[in-house]
Amino acid sequence: MSENTVIAIDLAKHSFHVCVLSTDNKVLTDKTFTRSSLKTWLLKQKPSLVAIEACGSAHYWAKLSEQYGHTTMLISPRFVKRFLSGHKTDKNDALAIAIASRQPDVKPIQVKTDEQLALQASERIREHYVDEQIATNNLLKSILYEFGITVAKGKRSLVKAIPDILEDAENGLPDVLRGEIHRLYQFWLELDELIQTSSKRQQQSINAHPKCSMLKALDGVGDVNALGLYLALGDTGASFKNGREAAACIGLTPKQHSTGGKTVMLGISKYIANKKLRSNL
């Protein structure tokens, strides 16, 4: 094998299908590996291009392949899907990945470092706490509303009102439900503490990070957006040819419809990119 040879890997938790494509697009290898056997096999191969669909654990396998001396390419699942023929099987998926890696218009996804993955995970954990708190807030309001108890808008208004609602014996709230509401109230308070702790740690990490601090100098970019831009653009966008490519990566360019030499620019496309980051920006 050589760097012109493509090793396409269809990832899963325990079973991995590999398709090796030669320079003249002939399938040299088409077999399934276990996790341990794939590592051993990759280590024995000569330096090649390892193409992987960007899914769960893709960054781990890309970095491992690079340690073994290979060149790696992470490809968007949407791009790979164009080249899938026949039924969706591990074999066909691996072949589609191999074919996609050979296309002239393929736009590889940058492999994230361990530091970037850790920052991304911490932000997802914080977002999970926030989502859980919103869900708990809405659940409490809907339960109380069924018994004719309304609370002013805002999450803080609800939390302040809960103790008084539980102590009011004349509001028609069944005794069997008061204990459940109290537990939900305590759960909300625990989530609020977790959010504050997580946000504080995240802010410290961002302030100590030189690239994030650089991004915060941009107008309208705070801690959360600086982290989002760093994770989306990598090394402050050094891998992009120009600012337009970077803007397209995060979904801030208008959708284009061209035909017959006429170009029509539409609204901001919502087809790609990080929806959370795009909405924040």
Regions found by a protein language model. Give the residues of each.
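Nucleic-acid-processing active sites and adjacent nucleic-acid-binding tracks
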Residues: 24-48
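Glycine-rich, often acidic, oxyanion-interacting loops/wings at catalytic, nucleic-acid
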Residues: 124-214
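A short alpha->loop->secondary-structure connector
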Residues: 65-72, 88-91, 148-153
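Short alpha-helix plus adjacent loop in nuclease-associated cores
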Residues: 73-110, 114-121, 162, 260-272
